[in-house]
């Protein structure tokens, strides 16, 4: 018996390709010290021309009859997280197809096609017929619910020309089993900020909220690489 030999180099290449495909199924892990979420310090105002006898400095005015709210780059705002999302969907499909056909030939060029059966019984003929039926049914349901509550204090990263505040920041918490983080970025109207410098996360436009973590607890909630292979779209069955 001839044996087919496979080069070891081909086996190595195939293994590397499989590992690469499986690594793409792994969710990226958040890392600390991301420059995008770093605290933004207040900008140093440009020195204005000296105004003899004046104590007013442009850019640092305050309303004597209003509340002090964040409105400059580097100011601090506390965001109250009150996110609740629920989604559900269902789909049902059914398809049925029936077909029946028959073919009967009794003569060809004027000659009969029916012949005597040498075994006995009925005469032989070229008549044919078939029946076909096909049925396909499908049913699918999905439901998901998420909730996130808490608070994160962020800084004003930029002030748009229309007065909208671009805020972003993060909170890292080191626990016994690893690290937990909450990141948030978005746009806030100054009118939505409460008197205590807090704003609800539901009032943030273009919000980017991330809740993730690292450590033993995060690892146990992730399936292994072998399980991810069978759950990936690349699995042929």
UniProtKB/Swiss-Prot annotation:
Membrane association type: Lipid-anchor
Subcellular location: Cell outer membrane; Bacterial flagellum basal body
Covalent lipid sites (N-palmitoyl cysteine): 25
GO terms under biological process: bacterial-type flagellum-dependent cell motility
Example of a GO cellular component annotation carried by this entry: bacterial-type flagellum basal body, distal rod, L ring
Signal sequence region: 1-24
InterPro entries registered for this protein in UniProt: Flag_Lring
Pfam families associated with the record: FlgH
Disulfide bonds: none
Chief localisation class: membrane
PROSITE patterns on file: PROKAR_LIPOPROTEIN
GO molecular function, one term: cytoskeletal motor activity
Residue positions of covalent lipid attachment, annotated as S-diacylglycerol cysteine: 25
UniProt keyword terms in alphabetical order: Bacterial flagellum, Cell outer membrane, Lipoprotein, Membrane, Palmitate, Signal
Function (record text): Assembles around the rod to form the L-ring and probably protects the motor/basal body from shearing forces during rotation.
Complex and partners: The basal body constitutes a major portion of the flagellar organelle and consists of four rings (L,P,S, and M) mounted on a central rod.
Family membership noted in the UniProt record: Belongs to the FlgH family.
PANTHER family registered for this protein in UniProt: FLAGELLAR L-RING PROTEIN (PTHR34933:SF1)
Protein name: Flagellar L-ring protein
């Amino acid at each position: 018996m001839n044996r087919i030999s496979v080069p070891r180099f081909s086996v190595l290449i195939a293994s590397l390709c499989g590992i690469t495909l499986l690594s793409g199924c792994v969710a990226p892990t958040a890392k600390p010290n991301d420059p995008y979420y770093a605290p933004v310090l207040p900008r140093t105002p440009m020195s204005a021309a000296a105004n003899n006898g004046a104590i007013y400095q442009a850019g640092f005015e305050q309303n004597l009859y209003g509340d002090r709210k964040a409105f400059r780059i580097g100011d601090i705002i506390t965001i109250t997280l009150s996110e609740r999302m629920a989604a559900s969907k269902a789909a049902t499909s059914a398809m049925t197809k029936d077909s029946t056909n028959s073919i009967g030939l009794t003569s060809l060029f004027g000659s009969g096609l029916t012949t005597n059966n040498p075994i006995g019984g009925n005469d032989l003929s070229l008549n044919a017929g078939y029946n076909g039926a096909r049925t396909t049914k499908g049913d699918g349901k999905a439901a998901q619910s998420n909730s996130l509550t808490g608070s994160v204090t962020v800084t004003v990263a930029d002030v748009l020309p229309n007065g909208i505040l671009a805020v972003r920041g993060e909170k890292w918490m080191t626990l016994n089993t690893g690290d937990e983080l909450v990141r948030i970025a978005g746009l806030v109207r100054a009118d939505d900020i409460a008197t205590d410098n807090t704003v609800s996360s539901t009032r943030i436009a273009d919000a980017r909220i991330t809740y993730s973590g690292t450590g033993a607890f995060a690892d146990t909630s992730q399936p292994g690489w072998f399980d991810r292979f069978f759950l990936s779209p690349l699995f042929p069955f």
